[in-house]
Amino acid sequence: MVTEAQVVWVQKTLGVTRRAEPADGTTPTGGGAGDASGGGVFDDIKQFVVDLFTGKKAVKPADPVPRVELGKAQTDRADKLVAAMPKEDQSKVGELLEKAKPEEKKYLQKALASSHSAAELDAFYKQIAGKDKAWMDVNLHVVGDSKGQGVKQQWECSCGPTTIQAMKGELDPIYALKLRTDNPHLTEAKDDDATALNPNMAADQKAILVAHGGIATNRDTDGKGIALGGALNEQKGVTGLKFDTEDVPDDKFDARLAELDSALSGGLPVPIRVSSPGATGGHFVLVVGGELGPPRVYSIHDPWDGKIIKASEADIKAKKLNIAGWTQITHIYKPSADVPTVGS
């Protein structure tokens, strides 16, 4: 049994303590790790202590995330975008889809639905042709690798921008491959220097954060988060999705969960906001998969730790989550397709 004294000893040794999360309390904002009631860095300390004093892992690493199939929203958008292309480009895309293997074709269609040109699709096909499924599962996604790891927020309060990066990486394999190529340490972050490991990814996160009124600071310094709805909907031209911000009161829990299931079964990841009863702060994460069960279990990417967390319906309903110190879902950002009109 690990004692509180051992935890305190490690805190003093590492120079880390629990941290409070600032928020204005007027909009569903999100920032970094949990509030002063615990979680986040403090949970990492407890895990480290358990590993140090017992030689055992406190938490079993998450299994790799089952990849959702290409959904109707993206296939419909891909078809519409092809139809809007010049005839020469239509022929080029048709040839690519014809010669691609089934797994390659799926990713080509996802890239097409993400507004890439025929030339970009051709270059992408040359990068993935002949690659096996295991390679694609890692390199064409930015969450849920074989260790359950993925893209990590580089700034204290950039959970919203990082959730957007994770969402785009699940929808757009060209974006995912470039993000991985440009940021070989995207599952890591340096707490006292946000630009040390992944300067390109950090710059993108900061740009979204600052554009929406946030303040970018190193992970070990208090910053300011943002509301997510506007930043999500700015991606519509690329993703083809619009997002409705919906709260999750107790009397609408089942309805919101049904909406979540519907989106996931249609191949769409779902951003959500988590907080705790009585707290003003919060944290944005991305639901990337679900198992209908029973029991229903959801795979949630936490950008603070850069890891997949498994959450059961029972734990969600009982407000017993432990995501960066937060315990309940307060909002979901419901995606819906915005299919372009041919010729628009």
Regions found by a protein language model. Give the residues of each.
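Non-catalytic, low-structured ubiquitin/UBL-interacting segments
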Residues: 2-148
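Compositionally biased, intrinsically disordered low-complexity regions
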Residues: 17, 27, 32-36, 40-42, ...
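Alpha-helix initiation and N-capping motif
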Residues: 75, 90, 105, 118-121, ...
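Active-site nucleophile-adjacent alpha helix/oxyanion-hole segment immediately C-terminal to the catalytic cysteine
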Residues: 2, 64, 68, 73-76, ...
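Conserved active-site-adjacent core of cysteine acyl-enzyme catalytic domains
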Residues: 63-66, 73, 97, 124-127, ...
